[in-house]
């Protein structure tokens, strides 16, 4: 049986769907869910194959987006962190009528480094895939440590992420590999040029996975979108800067 785990909180007049990143689950939002559910009708989701959404194998980005949409409200602000940013972006491209605004957090339309495009070196992603087969819990923990490196609260932020992972059964190796394959191969830079709805991109200045060099490049490529960089955050700004993070989302709500 493959069901998407979905939790709804709050009674705001605007719906906000939160999509987590690779290897994690919706528990990662517990640091901000109380605050956000006082402003929005908040939807917490475990992506297919992650957390409590069991029974899924590796999915393509398009199939992952379709699976998530099955239980989604008719219209919402879609927020995706990291890999979740690609899923939210895919939903905008295929079902724009279901989206009030798009928010990507520490996400890139193309995570993999390409010619004249900063990103994660393909051999690093391939290395993660190889190591998953050998010792996947350690590999996931390594990936989490990368996400908080360099911040003033790096240790406690990494602990918060690790606690999220360990709170629920680990995803299957093929699901984790499928997620890495999406990060390695997907490129939405051109398709997202045509997005006309409110589009907010949030970044961490210290992010080791999504280099800040992509921000001005995407400002130019997507002039209709807005970007904001958390000066002292890495890959998880909602954990290191929860108050500032929520403030930006509440401000966006006033504009949709």
Swiss-Prot record:
Catalyzed reaction equations: 6-carboxyhexanoyl-[ACP] methyl ester + H2O = 6-carboxyhexanoyl-[ACP] + methanol + H(+)
Q: Where does substrate bind?
A: 22, 82-83, 143-147, 235
Q: ATP-binding among the record's keywords?
A: no
Could you name the Gene Ontology cellular component terms for this entry?
cytoplasm
Query: Predominant location of this chain?
Result: cytoplasm
Q: Which UniProt keywords apply?
A: Biotin biosynthesis, Cytoplasm, Hydrolase, Serine esterase
Q: Does the keyword Coiled coil apply?
A: no
The UniProt entry annotates the active site at: 82 (nucleophile), 207, 235
Q: Name one GO biological process term.
A: biotin biosynthetic process
* SUPFAM superfamilies per the UniProt record, alphabetical: alpha/beta-Hydrolases
Under Gene Ontology molecular function, one entry of this record is: pimelyl-[acyl-carrier protein] methyl ester esterase activity
The segment(s) forming the AB hydrolase-1 domain are: 15-242
Write down the top EC class of this protein: hydrolase
- Where's it found, cell-wise? Cytoplasm
Its annotated pathway?
Cofactor biosynthesis; biotin biosynthesis
Entry superkingdom: Bacteria
The EC number of this protein is 3.1.1.85
Q: How does it assemble?
A: Monomer.
Tell me which family the UniProt entry assigns to this protein. Answer: Belongs to the AB hydrolase superfamily. Carboxylesterase BioH family.
Q: What does this protein do?
A: The physiological role of BioH is to remove the methyl group introduced by BioC when the pimeloyl moiety is complete. It allows to synthesize pimeloyl-ACP via the fatty acid synthetic pathway through the hydrolysis of the ester bonds of pimeloyl-ACP esters.
PANTHER family (alphabetical): HYDROLASE ALPHA/BETA FOLD FAMILY (PTHR43194), PIMELOYL-[ACYL-CARRIER PROTEIN] METHYL ESTER ESTERASE (PTHR43194:SF5)
Protein's UniProt name: Pimeloyl-[acyl-carrier protein] methyl ester esterase
**Source organism:** Escherichia coli (strain 55989 / EAEC)
Gene name, please?
bioH
């Amino acid at each position: 049986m493959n069901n998407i785990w979905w939790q709804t909180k709050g009674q705001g007049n605007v719906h906000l769907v939160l999509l987590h990143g690779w290897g994690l689950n919706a528990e990662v939002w517990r640091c901000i869910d109380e605050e956000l559910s006082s402003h929005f009708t908040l939807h917490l989701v475990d992506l297919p194959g992650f957390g409590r959404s069991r029974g899924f194998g590796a999915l393509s980005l398009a199939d992952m987006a379709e699976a998530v949409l099955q239980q989604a409200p008719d219209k919402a602000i879609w927020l995706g962190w990291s890999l979740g940013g690609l899923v939210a972006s895919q939903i905008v491209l295929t079902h724009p009528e279901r989206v009030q605004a798009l928010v990507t957090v520490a996400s890139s339309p193309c995570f993999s480094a390409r010619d004249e495009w900063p990103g994660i070196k393909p051999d690093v992603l391939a290395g993660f895939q190889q190591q998953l087969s050998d010792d996947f819990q350690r590999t996931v923990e390594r990936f989490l440590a990368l996400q908080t490196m360099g911040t003033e609260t790096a240790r406690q932020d990494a602990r918060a992420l690790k606690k999220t992972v360990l709170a629920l059964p680990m995803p299957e190796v093929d699901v984790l590999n499928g997620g890495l394959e999406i990060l390695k191969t997907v490129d939405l830079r051109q398709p997202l040029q045509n997005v006309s709805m409110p589009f907010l991109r949030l970044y961490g200045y210290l992010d080791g996975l999504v280099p800040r060099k992509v921000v001005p490049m995407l400002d130019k490529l997507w002039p209709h979108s807005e970007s904001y960089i958390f000066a002292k955050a890495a890959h998880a700004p909602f954990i290191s800067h929860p108050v500032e993070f929520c403030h930006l989302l509440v401000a966006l709500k006033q504009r949709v």
